[in-house]
Regions:
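Helix-to-loop junction immediately C-terminal to a conserved catalytic motif
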Residues: 426
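C-terminal portion of ABC ATPase nucleotide-binding domains
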Residues: 502-503, 559, 576-624
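Membrane-integrated ABC transporters
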Residues: 1-46, 61-72, 90-94, 122-162, ...
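Extended non-transmembrane interhelical loops and adjacent amphipathic helices
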Residues: 1-18, 99-145, 224-273, 345-358, ...
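Transmembrane helix-loop-helix hairpins at lipid-water interfaces of multipass membrane proteins
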Residues: 32-89, 157-214, 298, 305-314, ...
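Primarily ABC-family ATPase nucleotide-binding module
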Residues: 249-254, 352-406, 486, 563-566
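Cytosolic ends of transmembrane helices, especially the final helix of ABC transmembrane type-1 domains
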Residues: 299, 320-357
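ABC-fold ATPase nucleotide-binding domain signature/coupling loops
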Residues: 437, 494-527, 536, 621-624
Length: 624
């Protein structure tokens, strides 16, 4: 993330934090209340004890009446106990809300990814920006995570300042008696001005030094971003990935990881973090603490001299010293919070740069009219496409038309444009040149959700989630159980379904349930196919979803799929050409262009064609 050297103004800082707070309150209503209440109690309770303790010391140093001493002691115990109990209750509430906030902030990112144009979602710049946001959060919790801290510190600072002022004002109004001799000089206005200037200086210089430390820390965050990403990947992500654990053990990848982490070295001896802690960051914070100690010493001398002169009793000494130093500390906390917010504003800016990525894909208004006759005609007219940021055409001058109810197979070598063709058909991307027509109308003129609704797709990198089997098939917790069961049986999952004690209610995977079941790659593909069948859309597309199956199982599923597809238009992508023999038409892709089109027999008859070469290249492994 590139930051402006001068940073954000206070107005911009408060504006972006207000926006962030609104977003947090929207997804987690009332989320900040426990932090506010806890801060008030945390800041106010010490002053009550300070005032009561001063009264107790005054009584001890004068009349020492047992009943009065007992009264003050009981008050101190009662107030301390009540404050501790209240803080414990609020702390519990705060911890629950803190966990909720940490989880719910992910909702904003999820919502954005779900609303974002797929082209932007798939763009490398978007991925890099989101990775930077993650690294900022991992670095020191920058971004949304700090909002609860600011609420706490701001309320605590304001409450502390008001409480300290109430206990301190009499320090400057009480006069040393004239009988105190030279100590009456403490009544001179210059002493008052001097003490106030010292308080102001420490209050301002302390946060300035802390702000300098934050600034250095932020600069460091940019410098070590890649190193922190490497460390986080190997230290936190890889160990939990059980699917890669076999490779790690077999090939001793942990040694490679350790070497990589040592090479980037951001936390060890001599690392950028260590150097910053020993220089700018460490020295700035140490100097800020030293100034606070100097203030405490000067205030102690001033208060003790006034007490010695007879301005007030000895009990007030602890009251005034504690109040003045606490006043300075809370004022410094308030200013430090502002400095911290200015630093955090830059990280929030990165977050909102991501959240504010506009959707540029044209949204039409026509409906696709869920036709009962399923008469949909699709045509690619001179379509060319290249991925954002690339100079290479993934598809070039593609012309193709397929009729309703037909079976179309798309074949070709890796990188020939097969999956790109499907992405354009499903309007995950729009072509740079040419048109894709549905019933003679440019697909961009249809409502996006309506258009997407006519497709059931099983991508080669499909995803199942840790939810019940039936919910995975239906895409909803409420579904037609008979229909879901039939879809699974049609997809070849009947035997495994019968072996599942809970049937459709069986939880997939163990991430969220100890009773979850693990499914093999082939079984997962059958579930994904069942999901496509359950949707019952007029177009069904299989983008190499059976790669984890053996050739015989794949051929069986495709043959059965041809039966259950009925009058649907089916499009198949497969590297195994034998699985596509039953299709009405086969399109051969090569380097982004359709170079052959026809039936299996027609294409095989062309001995100089690409299809013939591909067919025989595969056939040699299945014939003697």
């Amino acid at each position: 993330m590139k930051k402006k050297a001068e940073g954000m103004s206070l107005r911009e800082t408060f504006a972006i934090h207000r926006r962030a707070a609104r977003d947090m309150r929207r997804i987690a209503p009332g989320c900040f209340m426990p932090f506010i209440l806890c801060a008030v109690v945390e800041a106010a309770s010490p002053y009550a004890v300070i005032w009561l303790s001063a009264r107790l010391v005054d009584e001890l140093s004068t009349l020492r009446r047992p009943e009065i001493l007992a009264k003050w002691v009981l008050w101190i115990v009662a107030v301390s106990a009540a404050a501790a109990l209240l803080k414990a209750v609020l702390e519990r509430w705060k911890n629950v809300r803190s966990e909720l906030l940490d989880r719910q902030k992910e909702v904003l990112y999820t919502e954005k990814f779900l609303r974002m144009d797929y082209a932007d979602c798939d763009r490398q710049e978007t991925r890099d920006l989101f990775s930077q946001i993650r690294q900022n959060a991992d670095w020191s919790g920058w971004g949304f995570a700090h909002l609860k801290l600011y609420y706490t510190q701001a309320v605590q600072g304001i409450t502390g300042i008001l409480g300290a002022a109430a206990l301190t004002v009499s320090l400057f109004t009480r006069q040393v008696p004239t009988s105190a001799g030279k100590l009456t000089a403490l009544n001179h206005p210059l002493f008052l001005v001097g003490i106030l200037l010292l308080i102001a200086a420490v209050t301002c210089l302390g946060p300035a030094l802390v702000g300098r430390a934050y600034s250095a820390w932020n600069t460091l965050a940019e410098q070590v971003c890649f190193g922190n990403r490497v460390f986080s990947h190997f230290a936190f992500m890889q160990p939990g990935d059980k699917e890669k654990d076999m490779d790690r053990r077999m090939y001793r990848q942990s040694e490679l990881a350790e070497h990589y982490v040592r090479t980037v070295n951001i936390f060890g001896v001599g690392s950028p973090v260590a150097k910053a802690s020993q220089t700018t960051v460490g020295l700035s914070k140490a100097l800020a603490a030293s100034l606070s100690a100097v203030l405490s010493g000067v205030v102690y001398v001033f208060v003790c001299l006034k007490a010695l002169g007879g301005a007030f009793g000895i009990g007030s000494v602890t009251q005034y010293v504690s109040a003045v130093t606490t006043f300075s500390g809370n004022a410094a906390l308030l200013l430090s919070t502002v400095s911290h917010m200015r630093a955090n504003a830059e990280f929030l800016k990165a977050i909102y740069t991501f959240l504010d990525i506009p959707n540029s894909m044209y949204q039409g208004s026509l409906t696709t009219e869920k036709r009962s006759d399923r008469q949909y005609d699709v045509e690619f007219k001179d379509v060319s496409f290249r991925y954002p940021g690339s100079d290479i055409w993934a598809l070039r001058h593609v012309n193709m038309r397929f009729k309703v109810g037909k079976r179309l197979a798309i074949v070709g070598e890796n990188g020939s444009g097969k999956t790109t063709f499907i992405k354009l058909l499903c309007r995950l991307y729009d072509p740079q040149e040419g048109q894709i027509l549905l019933n003679g109308i440019d697909i961009r003129k249809y409502r996006y959700d309506d258009y997407m609704g006519i497709f059931s797709v099983v991508f080669q990198d499909f995803q199942l989630i840790c939810q019940p089997l039936g919910a995975n098939v239906a895409g909803s917790m409420e579904y037609d159980r008979d229909r879901a069961r039939k879809a699974l049986i049609d997809a070849g999952f009947a035997d495994r379904l019968a072996a599942m004690e809970k049937g459709l209610d069986t939880m997939l995977y163990k991430n969220l349930s100890e009773d979850g079941v693990e499914v093999s790659g082939g079984e997962a593909q059958k579930i994904a196919i069942a999901r496509a069948l359950y949707k019952d859309a007029p177009f069904i597309i299989l983008d190499e979803p059976t790669a984890a199956l053996d050739p015989i199982a794949e051929a069986e599923i495709y043959s059965k799929f041809d039966e259950i597809a009925g009058n649907k238009t089916a499009i198949y992508i497969s590297h195994r050409l034998s699985s596509c023999k039953f299709c009405d038409e086969i399109a051969v892709f090569h380097e982004g262009a359709v170079i052959q089109q026809g039936s299996h027999a027609e294409l095989l008859a062309d001995r100089g064609g690409k299809y013939y070469a591909l067919w025989n290249a595969q056939a040699q492994y299945y014939t003697e």
